[in-house]
Amino acid sequence: MKNLPLRRGQLVTTFGPGALVISPEGESAMIGALDKWYHDKNECRIETLDEFEIQEPRLKSLLKVKQLLMPPDFRPSYEYKNAVGAITQTNTDLYIPLLRFPTWQYCPKCKTLHQSSMSSRTSWLDCKECKKQMKMIQVPFVMVCSHGHISDFPWREWVHGDENTLCEGQMKLLSTGGATLDSLKIKCSCHKERSLKGIMSRKITSDMDEHRVSELSKLLNKNEKKIYKCPGNKPWYGSENYKESCVSYPIAVLKNSINVYYPNTISAIHLPVENPEVEKLIHIFEKNGITLSWLQVVDGIENKIKVVKKLCSSEIQEYKYSDIELAILYIEEGLGVESSPEKESTRNAKKELRTKEFETLIQDIDTKNLKIKKEWTCEVVDKNDISTFFSLINRVTKLKETIVLTGFNRLTTDDKAAHNQMLKGKHLLFKDPDLPENNWLPAYKVYGEGIFFTINFERLKSWEKRPDVQSYFNKLITRTEKRGINIDVDVIKPRNVLLHTLSHIIIDELAITCGYNSTSIRERLYLNEDQCGILIYTSSGDIDGTYGGLVRMGRQEHFFPVVVKAIDRARWCSSDPVCSEIGRSSGQGVNNLNGAACHSCSYLPETSCELGNLLLDRTLLIDPNLGFFNY
């Protein structure tokens, strides 16, 4: 495989450690563990990471890490040599480790299976059957489990019906020409053969993973009742032989399937420090390369202040001693997310992040990384006016968002599973997470603009308490309970489904009106008990952010007509009456968690939605009897 260019932002989301990437030539490889990032071509770790560090103390405090680091960019050393051959640039020739996976491949001519090492960089191998070198094709299947493990499909064990087989015969992957797994079979030179029927099936007998027995686990061992368990492989650690104990039942999936890798990320909007002087000092420190790792070298706050004054003497001489001290403490300790016993829960800490953002977004602010202009506050008395359903509109002309990769899931995006993976995410991302030098997580920062608005809270509470709304919504709660689905109880509320659906239809309308592709517009929901806000924004990796088209739509003369059009458009789906009727009766979408919502009316691209296109229902918006906007 040739060197594969990836964007830095992709390494924090879609293509993080443990993910499979496909090259333009069709070869697949796995991103290596974080232990091997920031190593040069000689496999040596670089000495300083200061230039990659992102200052977001709130997230560092929440995630209990010392550093948030941007993935390294590639700088070829030959471009930075002077006339005498000396390298004039630091941190050159940094690669992200790639490991060939799956390691099994077959000859396109004779279909014979061959296995190569994960370090192999070529698809050209000597075919024992054809007696010449052939460009091999990697097999389409891998084996995964919901605990994050991934392995080569057990071809030899499957064809012999025995996980302890000793046969080392030559195998072939043959097709009889059909379009189902039954038409694919594996054949061994010992005359054993078997179709692949059932390898991707799973029978669910309980909401507990240990009882979700896959057909692969039940059928692999033909002659005994032994259930096949996941071997616990973590090939992204760099070794084909690394295994750990696992009680899960694996399942075969296509290697390019979306459920092979679901990244778990957490993000935060950068908020200004309450003291504007401290905020300015933090930016001065960042500009001069004064980071957390740098401050930790110096002992004592007084010594740190002395050294900082020497490095930034001309820029900070007018600032108070106390402000300089606070700026240093902010970087070191992450002031802003207090650590207390009652806030040790990750869920509570995430809520605290959103609460502080909400409290900031309702204000008028003008700082370097966050600029908010108050546009409109509800003063209208006319109940027939659409504006009476809203209480506030603010135009966010500039924002900075930091996105951190905390772990990943395979097979499921279940809320409880995602929460558990976040708690143990470092053990998936790092081979040795407890080493002092591994106390960091990969992060990426983006700049953008957006519209922040809140719903009339009193009107929302009154609507939510109506018996017909409660009766209708209880159907969704019953469906989740019957299926044993784990979703945060604070999320399953009529108001939250309403806000989420409203966000989607407004994003769709904004994409049509202001020319943005809907994939580039995102939502950020504020759903805590006393909040009912939505931030619709767009962002990019460029520090200049975007061009103001979305912010312009936040002006009241543009925003309310957009809302009216969005609601009118939501009244009819091209899949109606099916969409509406199924939504009212049995629900639809993954685990039937949606009401009247489908790809034709309410779904957004995955990059835009915070909740995976779940918990959507147009009925709560526009139904003549119980719709919020008809109340």
What do these predicted ranges mean?
Residues 1-159, 170-175, 182, 227-631:
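Extended, well-ordered protein cores
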Residues 118, 200-202:
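Short, surface-exposed polybasic-aromatic patches that bind anionic ligands, especially phosphate groups
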Residues 131-134, 192-199:
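Short Cys/His-rich micro-motifs in 6-15 aa windows
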Residues 186-190:
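C-terminal interaction appendages of subunits in large macromolecular complexes
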Residues 203, 217, 258:
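Nucleic-acid endo/exonuclease domains
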Residues 206-210:
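A Rossmann-like FAD-binding core segment of flavoenzymes
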